[in-house]
């Protein structure tokens, strides 16, 4: 918990409001309450600002006149937000072995595991050797967690989970802000990873925690080896992700989606339910209609892509034909 006066000093902001107000955490601009801090990056979100119930908003001076609550006025909003997040970052306490506060039911724990404070592990779980489970993690029943897995602070795992060797759940997301000298400042990721029931996660997959809200993997999802899932991603029920797929930050995949091996989904892309992505494709825009999509430069409907591929393979013949036609026209 920090007062607005303390926060203003930390981020070098002009405080407009009560310096004694206490702030307990950070939330998105849509959901922040009177004890939480949020930020508004530009005038695109002015309607959100007008209706904000946040305890304080980081913003620039142009938006101050419509701010209904306490304000921290800065020139570089994103940089100030990045600095503010570190005030609310919970530090994991390193501990050797199993912390006495951990609640472990009928589970088998192999040697060399580290289990932190206030961890809860359900019935009939198997925790293999060299697994690290940090503070405040919750694991349901019948989980199989294989060697060298790391489940980091505050994450939640459902029932009937299989987590293969080398998986990292809850790693810090790739969020950074630049100052005037183009130096980078990291954003502390305050969200968690929440994984539902009946999920399988392949070896050496990494799932980043959310920036403010949680990264979510819903019931029945299947994830292959070497997949990277960035911060704030939501993967809905019964979707399947093949090996070496990269899913950028803040993407949302609908129910029953299938993503082929080696595909890339760039940040802030939404996929509707029942979408199939061909392996090695690059998805760089929202797909709102179910179907099979393929594309290695820009994504398109699969049937259209097949026609384009035929044209590309015969492009030299088409050019040769057109040159002959052009020559004949010139001779007339």
UniProtKB/Swiss-Prot annotation:
InterPro entries: Hexapep (IPR001451), LpxD (IPR007691), Trimer_LpxA-like_sf (IPR011004), UDP_GlcNAc_AcTrfase_non-rep (IPR020573). Pfam families: Hexapep, LpxD. The keyword Lyase does not apply. It catalyses: a UDP-3-O-[(3R)-3-hydroxyacyl]-alpha-D-glucosamine + a (3R)-hydroxyacyl-[ACP] = a UDP-2-N,3-O-bis[(3R)-3-hydroxyacyl]-alpha-D-glucosamine + holo-[ACP] + H(+). Pathway: Bacterial outer membrane biogenesis; LPS lipid A biosynthesis. One of its GO terms (cellular component) is membrane. The active site is at residue 231. GO terms for biological process: lipid A biosynthetic process. GO terms for molecular function: N-acyltransferase activity. Signal peptide: none annotated. Keywords: Acyltransferase, Lipid A biosynthesis, Lipid biosynthesis, Lipid metabolism, Repeat, Transferase. It is an enzyme of class 2 (transferase). Its EC number is 2.3.1.191. Disulfide bonds: none annotated. PANTHER family: UDP-3-O-ACYLGLUCOSAMINE N-ACYLTRANSFERASE, UDP-3-O-ACYLGLUCOSAMINE N-ACYLTRANSFERASE 1, MITOCHONDRIAL-RELATED. HAMAP family: LpxD (MF_00523). Belongs to the transferase hexapeptide repeat family. LpxD subfamily. Homotrimer. Catalyzes the N-acylation of UDP-3-O-acylglucosamine using 3-hydroxyacyl-ACP as the acyl donor. Is involved in the biosynthesis of lipid A, a phosphorylated glycolipid that anchors the lipopolysaccharide to the outer membrane of the cell. NCBIfam families: lipid_A_lpxD, PRK00892.1. This is UDP-3-O-acylglucosamine N-acyltransferase. It comes from Vesicomyosocius okutanii subsp. Calyptogena okutanii (strain HA). The lineage of its organism: Bacteria, Pseudomonadati, Pseudomonadota, Gammaproteobacteria, Candidatus Pseudothioglobaceae.
């Amino acid at each position: 918990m920090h007062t607005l006066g303390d926060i203003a000093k930390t981020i070098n902001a002009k405080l407009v409001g009560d310096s004694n107000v206490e702030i307990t955490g950070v939330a998105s601009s849509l959901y922040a309450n009177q004890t939480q801090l949020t930020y508004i990056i530009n005038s695109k979100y002015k309607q959100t600002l007008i209706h904000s119930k946040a305890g304080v908003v980081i913003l620039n001076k142009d938006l101050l006149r419509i701010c209904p609550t306490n304000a921290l006025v800065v020139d570089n909003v994103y940089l100030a937000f990045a600095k503010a997040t570190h005030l609310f970052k919970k530090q994991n306490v390193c501990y050797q072995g199993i912390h006495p506060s951990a609640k472990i039911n009928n589970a088998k724990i192999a040697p060399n595991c580290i289990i932190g404070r206030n961890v809860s592990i359900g019935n009939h779980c198997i925790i293999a050797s060299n697994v690290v489970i940090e503070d405040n993690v919750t694991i349901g029943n019948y989980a199989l967690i294989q060697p060298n897995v790391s489940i980091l602070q505050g994450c939640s795992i459902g029932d009937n989970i299989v987590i293969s060797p080398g998986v990292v759940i809850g790693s810090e997301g790739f969020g950074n802000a630049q100052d005037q000298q183009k130096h980078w400042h990291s954003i502390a990721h305050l969200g968690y990873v929440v994984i539902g029931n009946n999920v399988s996660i392949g070896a050496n997959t990494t799932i980043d925690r959310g920036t403010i809200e949680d990264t979510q993997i819903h019931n029945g999802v299947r994830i292959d080896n070497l997949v990277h899932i960035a911060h704030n991603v939501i993967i809905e029920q019964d979707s399947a992700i093949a090996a070496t797929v990269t899913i950028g930050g803040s993407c949302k995949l609908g129910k029953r989606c299938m993503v082929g091996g080696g595909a890339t989904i760039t940040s802030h892309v939404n996929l509707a339910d029942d979408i199939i992505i061909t392996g090695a494709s690059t998805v760089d825009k929202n797909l709102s209609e179910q179907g099979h999509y393929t594309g290695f430069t820009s994504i398109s409907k699969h049937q259209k892509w097949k026609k384009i591929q035929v044209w590309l393979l015969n492009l030299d013949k088409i050019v040769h034909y057109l040159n002959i036609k052009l020559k004949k026209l010139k001779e007339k």
